[in-house]
Amino acid sequence: MSAEENKASVRRFFEEVCNGRNLRAAEAIFDPELVYHEPLSVSPGGKGITAIQNEVSIYHKGFPDAQWSVHEVLAAENDKVVARWTGQGTHRGELPGIPPTGQKVTVEALTLFTCKNGKIIEMVDLWDALSMMQQLGIVPPPGHASS
C-alpha cells in the first residue's frame, strides 16, 4: 500500500473508532493479528482487534465526552506512520481502579503505526500518562506533597 493509503487508515481509526465511537469499524482498519502496546493498558501486549476495541472502550466509558484531535499524520519509511494527537475529556466514568473524579483532562501523545496490506498490524501508543494522573488528582504535581 502507498504511504497515503496507510495514512488514510490511521485517520480512519481516529475518526471512526475513537471520535465516531464505532468500535466495529476497527475490523476494517486493523489486521486480525494486531499487536497493541500502550503504557497503561489493561491487557499489556494486547493482540488482535479486540485489544484495541477494549482499550478504546475503556476511554469512552471513563471519558464519555472524549475527543481525539489529530494534529499531524506523517508517513515514515515503508510501512510506518506516526500520528501526533491530543486526547481531551471529562472523567465521568470509572477507569480501571480509578473512580470518576469529574476532572477535565488533556493528554498529548504520539502513536507509531505499522501497516501491512492496507491494515494496521501494530500500534505503539506513547502518551503522557503521568500528566493524566496528575490532572485526575491521583499523583501530585511536582513540588506538592501528597496528602
Task: Report each predicted region and the residues it spans.
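C-terminal and inter-domain tail/linker signature
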Residues: M1-S147
